[in-house]
Design a protein with these regions (language model features):
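Histidine- and/or cysteine-centered catalytic micro-motif in compact active-site loops
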Residues: 3, 97, 137-140
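N-terminal segment of the mature soluble domain
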Residues: 44-46, 50-134, 173-184, 204, ...
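"Short basic amphipathic alpha-helical interaction patches in structured regions
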Residues: 55, 147-153
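C-terminal/domain-edge helix-coil "capping" segments
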Residues: 19-49, 85, 126, 137-148, ...
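Short, P/G- and charge-enriched loop/turn segments at secondary-structure junctions
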Residues: 120-122, 152-157
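Short, aromatic- and cysteine-enriched interfacial helices/patches
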Residues: 7, 15, 151-154, 211
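Bacterial Sec-dependent N-terminal signal peptides
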Residues: 1-21
Length: 213
C-alpha cells in the first residue's frame, strides 16, 4: 500500500511540477514606503506550440493570440492586486486600471505590446506612477477569447500537459531599479482562465513580495 502511495505522490509531483525563484532588493522596504501608485503593463506573451500544432494557425493568428493573452493577464493581475487592496494587505495606495494604462500609452503613440525602447522612468513619467510591473510570459495553453478551446479543437492538444513560464519585474520608476523579480515555471494545471492562472502563479509567494503583507 505504501508503495502505491509513493508512486501516486511521485506522479502527482511530476504532473504539477513548478519552479519558483524570487529576488527582492536589499532596500525593498524603503522602496515600498516611497511607492504610492503602480501600473501593470501587458506582458510580452509568447504562445509556444509544437511544430505539428503550428500548422493550424497563421503567424498573425499566433501574434494576436499572444496579444489577447497579454491583456487578459494584465486584467487578471489588476484584479489580484485590487483584491489585496480591499483586504488591506496591499501596501500601495493606488493601482492604475489597465484600461487607463493602455489608453495613456496609446495616446502617447506607444504600442502596448512593444515598449522596450522606453526606460521604466520614462514609462513611469508618462503613466504617472511610482512602480511598473512588466515582464514575459510563455505558455502552451492560451486562455483568452476562447483561444484555449480553439487550440484544443484545431490542434488536438486538449489532453496535453500544460506548461507556463512567467518572469515578472517590479521596477521603481524614479531610478529604474529592479525591486522584485519573480520567476515561476509550471508544468501541470493552469486553471480554466487567466484569473485562475494568476492565482496559481502568485500562490505561496504573495506574502514574500514586499508590496503585500
Amino acid at each position: 500500500m505504501k508503495f502505491y502511495t509513493l508512486i501516486f505522490s511521485l506522479l502527482f509531483s511530476l504532473l504539477s511540477f513548478s519552479q519558483t525563484k524570487l529576488y527582492v532588493h536589499e532596500d525593498a522596504d524603503s522602496y515600498v514606503k516611497a511607492t504610492k501608485s503602480l501600473a501593470i503593463l501587458p506582458l510580452d506573451v509568447q504562445v509556444k506550440m509544437r511544430p505539428k500544432q503550428l500548422k493550424d494557425f497563421t503567424p498573425e493568428q499566433i501574434i494576436v493570440m499572444g496579444h489577447n493573452e497579454a491583456k487578459d493577464i494584465q486584467r487578471a493581475m489588476y484584479s489580484w492586486f485590487l483584491t489585496r487592496k480591499k483586504r488591506g494587505s496591499l501596501l500601495v495606495e493606488s493601482v492604475q486600471r489597465p484600461t487607463v494604462t493602455n489608453a495613456i500609452l496609446k495616446k502617447n503613440g506607444i504600442d502596448i505590446h512593444s515598449y522596450s525602447d522606453l526606460t521604466p522612468s520614462e514609462l513611469g513619467e508618462i503613466l504617472g506612477v511610482d512602480l511598473i510591473i512588466t515582464g514575459t510570459f510563455e505558455t502552451s495553453k492560451p486562455m483568452s477569447d476562447g483561444a484555449g478551446v480553439a487550440l484544443a479543437l484545431l490542434a488536438g492538444v486538449g489532453g496535453a500537459t500544460s506548461q507556463a513560464t512567467a518572469n515578472i519585474d517590479f521596477i521603481n520608476t524614479s531610478d529604474n531599479e529592479l525591486v522584485v523579480n519573480y520567476f515561476k515555471k509550471i508544468k501541470g494545471s493552469l486553471g480554466s482562465n487567466s484569473e485562475d492562472l494568476i492565482n496559481i502563479l502568485m500562490r505561496k509567494v504573495s506574502r514574500r513580495i514586499p508590496y503585500t503583507k
